[in-house]
Regions:
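Unchanged
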Residues: 1-85, 98-111, 153-157, 162, ...
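Core RNA-modification/binding signature centered on pseudouridine synthases
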Residues: 85, 89, 94-204
Length: 204
C-alpha cells in the first residue's frame, strides 16, 4: 500500500497535457470520443505493466521511430491522432530534451482540435485547424450531416495547397503527416512522416 500511495502522489507532477482531440461525428451516429493526450517522462522503465484485456490487450515499450516502423509493417495499428503525436515525439533526441520541452510549456495548455474528413478519389485527407481546406464553420455537433468529397486525387489536392495541417490516409497502415502551420501555445509541429516511403527520418 505505501508503494501505491507513492505512485499516485508522483504521477500528476510528472505529466502534462500534450494534445486534445474531439472526434468527428460519424454519419451513422454511435460513440464519439473527446480525448486528451498526456505526456509523462520516467527516469526508469516501470518494473511492471498490466492491461485490462479489454481496451488494452498487450503492451510494448518502444521509441517513436520503432513504433512507427511496426505500424508501417502492420504489426500494430494507430489511429491518425496517435500517429500524429508519435511524429511530434520524433522531434526530440533524448528523454531529457523532451521533458524540458514539456515542462517549459506545461502552463500553456493545448488547443482542442476536431478533424474533418475530405474524401478524394484515391484516399482520404484528415484536415485539422489551420489547413487551407479546413472549413470556416466546421460541424461540431453533426447536425448538418456535412460530407466533404472531391473527384480529385490526393496528389492533385496536395499540389494545389500551400498551408498544410493534414494527415493523408491511403489505407489503415499508410499515413502521411503534412504540417507547415505556425504552432500555438509554444507547441511543436510533428515531423512530416510518410509511412508509404522508406526515407523518413527522426532525431531519435
Amino acid at each position: 500500500m505505501p508503494n501505491r500511495d507513492k505512485e499516485i502522489s508522483l504521477r500528476p507532477a510528472g505529466r502534462s497535457a500534450a494534445a486534445s482531440r474531439l472526434q468527428i461525428c460519424a454519419l451513422g451516429g454511435g460513440r464519439r470520443y473527446d480525448t486528451a493526450f498526456y505526456l509523462c517522462c520516467l527516469e526508469k522503465r516501470p518494473p511492471r505493466t498490466s492491461q485490462d484485456d479489454r481496451e488494452v490487450t498487450a503492451f510494448r515499450w518502444s521509441s517513436p521511430p520503432e513504433a512507427i516502423e511496426c505500424f508501417k509493417c502492420q504489426e500494430i495499428r494507430f489511429a491518425p491522432p496517435q500517429f500524429y503525436e508519435l511524429c511530434r515525439l520524433c522531434n526530440f533526441s533524448s528523454l531529457h530534451e523532451l521533458h524540458k520541452f514539456s515542462s517549459d510549456r506545461a502552463l500553456e495548455g493545448c488547443e482542442r482540435w476536431m478533424s474533418v474528413i475530405l474524401t478524394a478519389s484515391d484516399g482520404y485527407i484528415q484536415l485539422l485547424p489551420g489547413d487551407d481546406l479546413y472549413p470556416e464553420d466546421p460541424d461540431y455537433t453533426g447536425e448538418k450531416k456535412t460530407i466533404m468529397s472531391t473527384d480529385k486525387k490526393v496528389e492533385d489536392l496536395m499540389k494545389e495547397g500551400s498551408v498544410f495541417h493534414r494527415i493523408v490516409i491511403k489505407n489503415i497502415n499508410n499515413l502521411a503527416v503534412y504540417v507547415n502551420i505556425q504552432p500555438k501555445y509554444k507547441h511543436m509541429n510533428p515531423l512530416m512522416i510518410n509511412t508509404g516511403c522508406s526515407d523518413y527520418s527522426s532525431r531519435l
